[in-house]
Amino acid sequence: MRLHHLLLALLFLVLSAGSGFTQGVRNSQSCRRNKGICVPIRCPGSMRQIGTCLGAQVKCCRRK
């Protein structure tokens, strides 16, 4: 029974770490690797923000 609890905790840790993977985009190279483009100010309506490029003003956007 203790093994089940350990495996459940490990599974939770792995799944929670992978869920926000694209939110770590912080430069133009990682933006392109995540199939995004760098756009100044705001993402267009057909795209969503997945991170930033070169600072907070330039957004990394990807199609919805």
Swiss-Prot record:
- Record-linked InterPro entries: Beta/alpha-defensin_C, Defensin_beta-like
Recall the GO molecular function terms of this protein's record: CCR6 chemokine receptor binding; chemoattractant activity
User: Is Disulfide bond one of the keywords UniProt gives this record?
Assistant: yes
Q: Where is the signal peptide?
A: 1-24
Tissue expression remark: In many of the exposed epithelial surfaces including conjunctivae, bronchi, colon, urinary tract and trachea.
Query: Mainly localized where?
Result: secreted
Per the record, what is one GO cellular component? extracellular space
Q: Which GO terms describe its biological process?
A: cell chemotaxis; defense response to bacterium; defense response to fungus; killing of cells of another organism
Q: State whether keyword 4Fe-4S applies.
A: no
Cysteines joined through disulfide linkages: C31-C60, C38-C53, C43-C61
Instruction: State the superkingdom.
Output: Eukaryota
**Keywords assigned by UniProt, alphabetized:** Antibiotic, Antimicrobial, Defensin, Disulfide bond, Fungicide, Secreted, Signal
What role does this protein play? Shows a broad spectrum of antibacterial and antifungal activities.
By sequence similarity, the record places it as follows:
Belongs to the beta-defensin family. LAP/TAP subfamily.
State the name under which the record lists this protein.
Answer: Lingual antimicrobial peptide
